[in-house]
């Protein structure tokens, strides 16, 4: 490190103390000498006085930053002037210490800057190894969806810590632990999903979103904006939570996506408040769309929302629904948002994350950008903070709206191909299929031969569903190799996994 102070000779005890702790300390008595030393050496840290002959500390700092903009700096000075503190903060000085300071104070400040990441990385490693066994023990005692949510949040928090501080090679262990948990989760869903669909009040599944989170606010004459970001995973929500908390008070909860964990089922359920079998009974055209595997299965969400408002006797509310599937459409929404703020209920559907998941299996460039879960998190986080969406969120935080952000389902990176026996009329999904007499190994799939028990549409005789479990995906034997090369290691949805089914709900109000 380099210590710059015109009275450096008075600081010899401090320098000796730092050297006894293993630091090498160079010194300078003025800013010009410090500038020369900085050009000729690569220091890890600068200790800097403000009041010196010639150029002062802030001028010296500007010269130093020209050479290395990211070098950390501790300012140690007698001055308590607030303007100097403000200037130091604006110049991204890491710490500001006021003389006199003890050797130990300076050592602690240096250690916090130079060794912080290493200390946190080591502690993260040891803490995870302790929690590893506790997670495995807790896995044996799970009896409810709340237990699963709590466990999954712990796993996601470890993923985020490894993203930030390094994983010391533990990412693979965490990945294997998540796979193990997913196997147990799949068994839990197979055994309990039918019961979850029978709950009429406070349903945790997709049809309960409106009644649980929006209706209480609407009945209290509060303005509400629901934002459904298609295919956004829990880890992607939590990675931007600190940023959102700078704008909103946030209550974090969850819901469970319907099976199959796909947009035609779960997102329609959010806006209609209906299960898929109820939906096709109330809206017969939906049945035709399903039977023909047609596009546009979600094009009536606006009508579904209005009908749901009517069923709950709040149809007098002014409503605006908007679906955004392209950047330009998002920019248009941003330009007109002040008009939409006159409404009582805003509904916004955003397809960016879903398109990213689908396109990453088709484009080599996206495969490079989103090679794994960490890359996926980083890409979504960057989009949140740098797109039109960020402007919209900031405007909403300053409005009188309560904002409910959620997703219809998540996604999972698939790695295990399994063969399916089906006729040519079966649906084309990678993680789920429906049709006549579908068959596969039930070790890696939930085979639903009585769809009506799970509130799924029965679209013909001998009709059944296959729902992939864990990280499996479906292939037909005649095209297996071609599609395996395309789908292996891609992000898909429609099946059973914590990543797909356990979906955060953020209820937010600006400060």
Predicted regions and their residues:
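Acidic catalytic/metal-coordinating carboxylates
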Residues: 29-33, 56-59
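Active-site beta3 strand of CheY-like receiver
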Residues: 41-47
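Feature captures the catalytic ectodomains and active-site-proximal regions of enzymes
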Residues: 16-17, 51, 86, 95, ...
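Active-site residues of response regulator receiver
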Residues: 49, 77
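The short loop immediately C-terminal to the conserved phospho-acceptor aspartate in CheY-like receiver
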Residues: 7, 50-51
């Amino acid at each position: 490190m380099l210590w710059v102070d015109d009275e450096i000779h008075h600081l010899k005890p401090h320098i000796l103390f730092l050297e006894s702790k293993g630091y090498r300390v160079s010194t300078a008595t003025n800013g010009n000498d410090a500038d020369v030393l900085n050009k000729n050496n690569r220091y890890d840290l600068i200790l800097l006085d403000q009041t010196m002959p010639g150029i002062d500390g802030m001028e010296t700092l500007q010269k130093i930053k020209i050479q290395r903009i990211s070098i950390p700096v501790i300012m140690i000075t007698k001055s308590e002037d607030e303007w100097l503190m403000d200037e130091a903060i604006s110049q991204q000085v890491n710490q500001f210490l006021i003389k006199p300071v003890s050797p130990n104070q300076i050592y602690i400040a240096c250690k916090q800057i130079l060794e912080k990441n290493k200390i946190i990385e080591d502690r993260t490693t040891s803490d995870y190894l302790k929690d590893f066994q506790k997670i495995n023990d807790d896995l044996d005692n799970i009896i409810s969806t709340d237990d699963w949510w709590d466990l999954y949040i712990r796993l996601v928090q470890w993923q985020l810590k490894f993203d930030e501080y390094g994983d010391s090679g533990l990412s693979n262990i965490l990945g294997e632990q998540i796979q193990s948990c997913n196997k147990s989760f799949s068994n839990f869903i197979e055994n309990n999903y039918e019961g979850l669909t029978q709950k009429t009040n406070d349903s945790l599944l997709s049809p309960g979103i409106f009644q649980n989170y929006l209706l209480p606010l609407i009945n209290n004459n509060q303005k509400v904006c629901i934002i459904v970001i298609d295919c956004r995973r829990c880890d992607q929500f939590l990675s931007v939570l600190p940023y959102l908390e700078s704008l909103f008070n946030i209550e974090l909860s969850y819901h469970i996506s319907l099976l199959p964990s796909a947009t035609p089922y779960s997102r329609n359920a959010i806006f209609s408040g209906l299960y898929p079998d109820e939906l096709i009974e109330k809206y017969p055209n939906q049945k035709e769309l399903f039977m023909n595997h047609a596009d546009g299965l979600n094009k009536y969400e606006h009508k579904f929302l209005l009908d749901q408002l009517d069923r709950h006797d709040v149809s007098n509310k002014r409503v605006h629904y908007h679906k955004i599937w392209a950047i330009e459409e998002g920019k248009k929404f941003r330009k007109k948002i002040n008009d939409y703020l006159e409404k009582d209920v805003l509904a916004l559907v955003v397809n960016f994350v879903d398109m990213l998941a689908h396109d990453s299996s088709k484009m080599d460039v996206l495969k490079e950008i989103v090679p794994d879960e960490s890359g996926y998190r980083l890409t979504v986080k960057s989009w949140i903070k740098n797109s039109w969406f960020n402007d919209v969120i900031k405007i909403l935080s300053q409005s009188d709206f309560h904002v409910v952000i959620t997703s219809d389902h998540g996604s999972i990176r698939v790695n295990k191909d399994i063969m399916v026996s089906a006729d040519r009329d079966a649906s084309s999904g990678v993680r789920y299929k429906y049709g006549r007499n579908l068959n596969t190994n039930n070790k890696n799939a939930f085979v639903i031969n009585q769809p009506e028990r799970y509130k799924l549409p029965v679209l013909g005789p001998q009709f059944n569903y296959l729902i992939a479990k864990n990280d499996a995906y479906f292939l037909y034997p005649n095209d297996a190799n071609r599609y395996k090369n395309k789908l292996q290691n891609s992000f898909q949805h429609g099946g059973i996994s914590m990543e797909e089914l356990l979906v955060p709900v953020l209820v937010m109000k600006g400060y």
